[in-house]
Amino acid sequence: MAGAVLLLPLLACGERKAQAQTSVPTTQTNEQGCTRQRSIGPQDPFQNPPPLKQACVGPYLLEIPQHLFYNQMGTEFDGSFSLVLQYPGLQPFAPGERMNLKLDVSMRTVAFAYWYIDRIELRQAMRNAYIPIWGDPEDPSRTLEGRIAGEPVYGLLPYYADLPRIRAYKARQGMRADAPVMKADWHQDWFITRDAAGEVDRLIRCTSREVGGTGVVFRDGLMYRHMQEPYSECQHQFMLPEHSTLVRISYVRFGLKDWQQIEAKARALFFDHLVSPHQ
């Protein structure tokens, strides 16, 4: 009888564990009403062919092969995600190739993030990237007007970081001459395009040209980190107006010349995997 009494708590504990296991939600719905199937339990990033995983961008549901996700397993627990291709070919990484991420694989990565904008107008979200909404508007590193306008390059209008002007401004703010913010690699050159109304509809911010070098070397068609040169990268931002979505892409600055192909891939990754609602 005593043994049976001792078993009762153990049985109750086992029952609670079983209930906890069966109560894990298999779907997740975001604020905009998009419901996606969650990936429950261990995931195999090496699975080939890769299974489809669901992701939401605002109200839009996408179904994407899992090897295209940054972690090659699907969304994060909260539904956030980014997608990846590799430069220069803009092809997918092989299933599992990004596990134990190596420096060269990381450097080849072109990462795509999609942000649904509904709290403010999409155009305003774009403006916030190049018109200061906080801090000192006189800081020449934070405005188009504080930069050096250059001749068009790759179909883009460049606004280079004016490092002497920036350093003079920072010195007036009390910064030491050897402070990190005084160094070229702290700052970015901006490249823009404008729409018919003159509004900036694309912004690409890259490590300052004053850093020099590309930071990359090619062997057998693959790109590797050039350890004797500094590394430069770009952050590329544009809009999908009809879907109220801001797209942000990161890649090595050497890839700036291919920005149009990279942007076309960003669009394809979204629209080719869009399930609902169709627009």
Model region roles, listed by residue range:
Residues 14-16:
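Bacterial signal peptide processing site
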Residues 2-10:
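Bacterial N-terminal signal peptides
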Residues 52, 59, 201, 242-244:
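Sequence-level motif detector for i,i+2 pairs with an aromatic at +2
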Residues 11, 32-33, 54, 204, ...:
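Extracellular secreted precursors and ectodomains with disulfide-bonded cysteine-rich loops/domains
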Residues 213-279:
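Long, compositionally biased interface segments
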Residues 6-7, 27, 199, 227:
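Residue-level signal for mature regions of secreted extracellular proteins and peptides
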Residues 18-193:
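N-terminal export/ancillary region detector
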Residues 169-230:
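Catalytic cores of processing enzymes, dominated by hydrolases/peptidases
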